[in-house]
């Protein structure tokens, strides 16, 4: 499948759970024919129970509902919680679940990290939010800052088709060679234009990164990137510095209060390289940053699930939308500049790690390890990801799959 730029869309930025969850639950409540929902994390907390209730009500009124969860991100939903949905007719699947080893999850690589909802081929949501109370301000200091978009218009057809082609039973010809797709060019830039881009482990391995690189090459005035987990490869870092050196104002917002300490360690290894290259780096200090958004000049923007780290850029299944729209760009710009002014600390010379031989050695080793991390993972024994569908009673039937597909004739379509 290859997507093209779609015109005539309605695009709405949604910030955090306070805006995202009511919009999603309302759309589910108004669904008439079909719901497709996939996410990395679904917790059995207050937010998770609201999603459960919305899907249950939809299924009970005859709406066809399908859910795909990641087996690593959502391992602990109770049988009772899931059974109630499957008994009502919800098709409930886990992407590549595996048993724990000494109580530890082992399936950490090549995860299904997308967050997409499609309602009746009319409305779609895509972004970085999971279904967890962690995305609500009421959660406290550890509540996550995140973004998504609500979409209406022709782009929804592309997102629906993408979902349908990745459902079980939809086989695709596999090629022994790897094809690389150029970033889809918008030959007639306008307003309300949206393009779906994704990353998989087949023909679209670096599509999202290619769009970022193309954006940095085309930038003329300003780029703002807000990304939770920032440790891209050398090509990306070089493109950032190159843009800054030709006079583009580059603002990079990263976690200052990370949910994982290693995130700060990794990002700070890059501070010298970025700051001395003219990139303005801001640490978001109010709470953990979980967003994956960016904008360029006055028309280009992206929102989605892809971080800028080795897992998202080289291993996980991800999905973003690229948006050409001045109003949306300005809305996102106002939001990001607002959190820079209110909740960020700019990294200056005093915050840079001292340039000692030890720090330099650590930086070089860490950088090259993370740079080659995906290739190292590729040397591990290969396995074919599996899809587990939960049918009442809740005894998963395992189906071999690669794209999220199956040959089990008993699986619901």
Curated annotation (Swiss-Prot):
GO cellular component, one term: membrane
Domain of life: Bacteria
Region feature Disordered, mapped onto this chain: 390-413
Annotated SMART domains: PLDc
Enzyme active site: 113, 115, 120, 290, 292, 297
HAMAP family documented for this protein: Cardiolipin_synth_ClsB
Protein name: Cardiolipin synthase B
Lineage: Bacteria, Pseudomonadati, Pseudomonadota, Gammaproteobacteria, Enterobacterales
Gene designation: clsB
